[in-house]
Regions:
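Generic structural concept
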Residues: 17, 43-50, 80, 113, ...
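Amphipathic protein-protein interaction modules
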Residues: 88-154
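Short, charged, low-complexity loops and linkers
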Residues: 1-6, 26-35, 99-109
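Charged/polar positions within long, soluble alpha-helices
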Residues: 25-28, 51-61, 88-95, 124-135, ...
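N-terminal interaction modules that seed assembly of large macromolecular complexes
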Residues: 2, 14-73
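Alpha-helical oligomerization segments
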Residues: 136-208
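Long, low-complexity or tandemly repetitive, helically biased scaffold regions used
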Residues: 51-105
């Protein structure tokens, strides 16, 4: 037990805790971000979270009771709704790496907001117990988080990463398209040349040539 309880103080565990805490804080303040910023940051922090989780030392539960949890249904729903609002029409994506594919030959529709909320729930519960500072529950919380990484949220993280990658580059394509549309739109400016005849600024000399021909005919 002494050896197992010391696992929580290993370097790889501390690094995972640091990244996990930052991941939770990032999602909690996501509502105030632009979608492009959120997507770009997610594509950086999610691979790091996966890497640190995959480097955790083997850990097994030593207590008789399950550790406390932090994320309630209300907390989960608030986060999911905020993320769904942020992602908008880019929230849904098609996935084949889900258990439901056993019963279907078609991709299953998933959502980035729900996947991230699921990951958040596991990570936040772990961080909450870790911050309590009790060795036994810290150890057991780590063991549960590690098990869920292999069985649940690790796969969701990878799937979400793929979807976010697609969103990022679709956003860039949309921005380039908008820029091209703006470049193709002509609006005369004060710097454009104009006839300036008689104080006129019509940008059309032909109107004055027509007027000159009309006046000439009348004089004859």
């Amino acid at each position: 037990m002494e050896k197992e309880s010391q696992t929580i103080f290993e370097k790889n565990v501390i690094e995972f805790v640091t990244v996990a805490a930052e991941f939770c804080a990032f999602l909690e303040r996501a509502e105030s971000m632009k979608r492009s910023t959120f997507v770009d940051t997610s594509l950086k922090i999610l691979p790091l979270l996966y890497l640190k989780a995959s480097m955790l030392p083997k850990c097994e539960t030593i207590g008789d009771e399950a550790p406390e949890t932090y994320v309630t249904e209300e907390i989960y729903e608030i986060l999911r709704i905020n993320l769904a609002g942020l992602m908008g029409d880019k929230d849904d994506y098609l996935d084949v790496f889900v258990q439901d594919m056993v019963y279907s030959d078609q991709p299953i529709k998933k959502s980035i907001s729900e996947d991230l909320s699921d990951i958040y729930q596991d990570i936040k519960d772990f961080i909450f117990v870790f911050q309590l500072g009790l060795n036994e529950t810290m150890n057991d919380s780590l063991a549960i988080c590690q098990e869920n990484f292999g069985m649940l949220w690790g796969q969701k993280l990878v799937n979400t990463l793929r979807a976010l990658h697609d969103v990022k580059y679709n956003l860039q394509d949309n921005e380039e398209e908008e820029e091209n549309n703006e470049e193709g739109f002509y609006e005369p400016s004060e710097d454009d040349s104009c006839c300036e005849e008689g104080g006129c600024h019509c940008h059309d000399d032909e109107c004055h040539r027509s007027e000159e021909r009309r006046v000439g005919k009348e004089s004859r």
